Every structure is written in C-alpha cells, then in structure tokens.
C-alpha cells in the first residue's frame, strides 16, 4: 500500500439526535467537532436517523393511508370509463 494516501481510520462518536443516543463506531469521516465520553475525547458527528431510530429497523412502520395509482385513477375517473366492451 502506498503511504499517506488512505484516510485515517479512528473511533468516531455518532449522535442520533432523534432519540438522543450515542454510538462509538470506527470510521474515516472527517469532522472538526469533538465530544468527551467516558473521559476520552472523540471526533463527533450528528445524524438524524440511525438503525436504532429508523422505522424499518425498529419495526414501528407507519401505515400509509394512500391507495395505489390504479385505485386512485379508478376513483377519480371511473365514471368516465365504460365497463362494457366495445363501447
């Protein structure tokens, strides 16, 4: 491997702001912010969604009340479409 071309791999603290949870993960992300956890200073990155807060991973999927495209079309324009063949 060539020297001095790879980014620095280090432990970074990611803060999921939606659930106020902190994760220490190895990463090469660059940041100017720092935070002190457990007496150690780490690079710090805020995120909006993580696997702990995303509905897909938590199992708290919200139900979508909208219908499919065909059902919406039929509802809006169904009265104009003839149900008889050849008409």
From Swiss-Prot:
<dbReference type="InterPro" id="IPR034704">
    <property type="entry name" value="Ribosomal_bL28/bL31-like_sf"/>
</dbReference>
<comment type="subunit">
    <text>Part of the 50S ribosomal subunit.</text>
</comment>
<dbReference type="GO" id="GO:0005840">
    <property type="term" value="C:ribosome"/>
</dbReference>
<dbReference type="GO" id="GO:0003735">
    <property type="term" value="F:structural constituent of ribosome"/>
</dbReference>
<dbReference type="InterPro" id="IPR002150">
    <property type="entry name" value="Ribosomal_bL31"/>
</dbReference>
<dbReference type="GO" id="GO:0006412">
    <property type="term" value="P:translation"/>
</dbReference>
<comment type="similarity">
    <text>Belongs to the bacterial ribosomal protein bL31 family. Type B subfamily.</text>
</comment>
<keyword id="KW-0687">Ribonucleoprotein</keyword>
<dbReference type="GO" id="GO:1990904">
    <property type="term" value="C:ribonucleoprotein complex"/>
</dbReference>
<dbReference type="InterPro" id="IPR027493">
    <property type="entry name" value="Ribosomal_bL31_B"/>
</dbReference>
<protein>
    <recommendedName>
        <fullName>Large ribosomal subunit protein bL31B</fullName>
    </recommendedName>
</protein>
<keyword id="KW-0689">Ribosomal protein</keyword>
<dbReference type="InterPro" id="IPR042105">
    <property type="entry name" value="Ribosomal_bL31_sf"/>
</dbReference>
<dbReference type="Pfam" id="PF01197">
    <property type="entry name" value="Ribosomal_L31"/>
</dbReference>
């Amino acid at each position: 491997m060539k020297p001095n071309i790879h980014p620095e791999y280090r432990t970074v603290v990611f803060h999921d702001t939606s659930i106020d949870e902190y994760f220490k993960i190895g990463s090469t992300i660059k940041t100017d912010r720092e935070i002190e956890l457990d007496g150690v200073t780490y690079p710090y990155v805020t995120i909006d969604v993580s696997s702990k807060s995303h509905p897909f991973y938590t199992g708290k999927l919200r139900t979508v009340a909208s219908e499919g495209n065909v059902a919406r079309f039929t509802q809006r324009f169904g009265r104009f479409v003839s149900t008889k063949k050849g008409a």
